[in-house]
Amino acid sequence: MLSDIEITHQTKLEHISKVAAKLGLNEDELELYGKFKAKISPRLEPSNSKLILVTATNPTPYGEGKTTMSIGLADALNSLNKKVCLALREPSLGPVFGIKGGAAGGGYSQLAPMEDLNLHFTGDFHAITSANNLISAMIDNSLYQENPLKIEKILWKRCMDMNDRALRFITVGQGGRTDGVPREDGFNITAASEIMAVLCLATSLSDLKERVANIMVAYDSDKKPIYVRDLGCEDAVCILLKDAIKPNLFQTLEHTPTLVHGGPFANIAHGCNSVIATKTALNLADYVITEAGFGSELGAEKFLDIKCRVAEIKPSAVVLVSTIRSLKYNGEANKDEITKPDMNALKKGIENLGGHIENLKGKFGQNVVVALNKFGFDTDEEINFVKEYCQKLGIEVAVCENFLKGGKGALELAELVLKACDKPSKINFTYEMSDDTKTKIEKVAKEIYGAGEVVFEEAALKKLEMIKELNLSHLPVCIAKTQYSFSDDAKLLGRAKGFTFSVKDLDIRTGAGFIVAVCGKIMLMPGLPKVPAAVNMKIDAEGKIDGLS
């Protein structure tokens, strides 16, 4: 089979103005970035369009194909003459050159041109990086200018959209008095910046400015918080973001319109594309497909409990993506023989799928359809077992082959999703906003993850008191934990239950408007692997790229 980039190069793409016309947009409404991408103005009016959330079972090192499935479903609906639009995240540049690769889908279900998307795209990440680092420069300048704010402990870090472990812990101001005040600092990857989360939850430019102003960046000598508004640069930060706040219009290989906008991490942030892009898509299309990062206990929970509240939206249907391979992995199959038939491992691992169905259907009250991403090594016996298991739970299953066949490989899924969208929809939230922070965390850990007990370590207990003092108990919670398990232990596979869930610390994100519960080591600046993907990339004399995936 051809590589992803070879498939892209063999596909004749439409001019972005032709793609825009499918959404009722004319060329005057586009800010063109070449032939195949454009920015559009936000449209935020209430809409009766159908929103479809794509989520997954717990991810494995192999990948479950969530973005590929989202694209395949959109192409299938497009082929059925439905007015459809995708609303997806922008990929981070760092992982493209590391081990993960890009985030444009795969096979014949891709966004294109994939090299445009995976590299600089329309410059949103660069604008976010500059905005983040302007705040850092303002902090260090305040220190240099005799520290009028009495800054004592700095929380804010610089950022860069690249995997570079050497920048995690650094010192700055080493050149003497004229070159700044010496201090310890560090870099996060841009996707981990609070500016990214703020941009993706903002509902307008004025809301963005208010959120930026409210970002807590330091504590003073009296242990009181210092905010961006105290630095006086919230307008300057938003000037850098005035174009980045506009959604980007793109297309799939089958020319389905796609809004690609924002890309916050799915652990320390909510892991969804921007509220503005999602609401704009809902104003332009009858069916909108979006996704949430990692498995449903992380990404979908944050989508439903955080994003849906902020945006005042709700899904009409939820697609739960899984693979036979991932279910066998969760059943502790031999990793060296994971592609071979193993009904014992599948029967054990399918409880992971059951746990996600229980949450989405039973807890959140969603209309769920399972999308089984089929591989060539899957057997009929294995596929039929998954179907029968889901049918007993009242869930329909579509076997999907869109990686190989494009939209026509997801037609069964499209039909099931259309049927699900015709049902009444609602959201049963995990917690009430009036609950205090501790109660909110306990409800997510016990009701969604399956924890038997929640333990707060000393640092977290101190932050709980601070949250009360700052009157921030009304904020939603965003739990940062491993994506590989329902629990906070990556090795606890399947459907873990009754475990002790440990909260190590709390990160107060006043700009984004949520409290991050830190439940394990969080990687905010990835490193490159032993053999980075960068070494396999080539570009010829005509500028044609190869080796990008």
Curated annotation (Swiss-Prot):
Keywords: ATP-binding, Ligase, Nucleotide-binding, One-carbon metabolism. The keyword Nucleotide-binding applies. It catalyses: (6S)-5,6,7,8-tetrahydrofolate + formate + ATP = (6R)-10-formyltetrahydrofolate + ADP + phosphate. Coiled coil: none annotated. It comes from the Bacteria. ATP binds at residues 60-67. It is an enzyme of class 6 (ligase). The keyword Ligase applies. One of its GO terms (biological process) is tetrahydrofolate interconversion. Signal peptide: none annotated. Its EC number is 6.3.4.3. NCBIfam families: PRK13505.1. This is Formate--tetrahydrofolate ligase. It comes from Campylobacter concisus (strain 13826).
